[in-house]
């Protein structure tokens, strides 16, 4: 599952960057500045890719060491080098904690500059987005609803954070980390749904569906959990009315269990 999620995110992000750059005029005198701007516009997605990818590798290699047992720490076996090399991935190219600062910081910046019109989007999603059929796929109706509900929750939580803290939000480590993990979980779900839409091979889709269902199950629960933590924190530190009631409504409207995966 983790490897599939990382693969989906990286292909989506790199493809989006390629499309954006392909639309630029190569004869323009500021072509490279425009290219840099295109890449910077994908800062959130790139940071998510780095975090998800490095943590997926960390999990897989750690399981590999467990399989090798004590031999996993002996240099004669390849897993020992993998374990050592993997650990640095979460440190260089921006530690994963710094990437979480980037994710939350850029989301805040885009919302304040109205690049993400969150208030208008919230008003349009009074039904939590469950009636939005644009992402719905046969056999994945409930999963599609979970993605749209998660989108609504992320928008509401970001709005609450801005109302309660303004730009000071980025200075609170608890809020920054939890909100970044919320965005990451939602991005995995949203990208997964889009990826499976593009699979035309019947057998490939049949084998991929359980992976996607498990991915959405895990990440939907992550969105609900992190959003509740953030809203509880806001209520304890600020008089702002949070979106806790909406989160509770969402969790009642769509409930997952492992039995629904297969």
Predicted regions and their residues:
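Flavin-dependent oxidoreductase catalytic core characteristic
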Residues: 1-262
């Amino acid at each position: 599952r983790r490897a599939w999620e990382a693969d989906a995110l990286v292909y989506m992000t790199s493809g989006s960057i390629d499309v954006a750059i392909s639309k630029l005029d190569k004869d323009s005198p500021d072509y490279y500045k425009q290219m840099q701007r295109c890449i910077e516009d994908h800062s959130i997605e790139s940071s998510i890719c780095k975090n998800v990818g490095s943590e997926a590798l960390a999990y897989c290699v750690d399981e590999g060491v467990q399989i090798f047992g004590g031999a996993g720490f002996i240099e004669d076996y390849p897993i020992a080098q993998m374990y050592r090399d993997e650990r640095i991935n979460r440190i260089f190219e921006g530690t994963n904690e710094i990437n979480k600062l980037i994710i939350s910081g850029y989301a805040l910046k885009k919302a304040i500059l109205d690049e993400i019109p969150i208030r208008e989007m919230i008003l349009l999603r009074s039904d939590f987005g469950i009636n939005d059929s644009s992402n719905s796929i046969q056999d994945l109706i409930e999963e599609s609803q979970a993605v749209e509900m998660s989108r609504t929750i992320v928008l509401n939580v970001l709005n609450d954070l801005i109302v309660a803290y303004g730009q000071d939000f980025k200075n609170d480590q608890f809020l920054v980390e939890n909100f970044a993990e919320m965005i990451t979980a939602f991005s995995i779900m949203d990208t997964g749904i889009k990826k499976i839409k593009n699979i035309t091979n019947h057998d490939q889709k049949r084998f991929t569906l359980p992976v996607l269902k498990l991915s959405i199950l895990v990440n939907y629960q992550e969105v609900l959990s992190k959003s509740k933590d953030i809203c509880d924190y806001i209520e304890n530190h600020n008089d702002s009315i949070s979106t806790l009631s909406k989160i509770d409504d969402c969790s009642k409207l769509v409930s997952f269990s492992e039995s629904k995966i297969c």
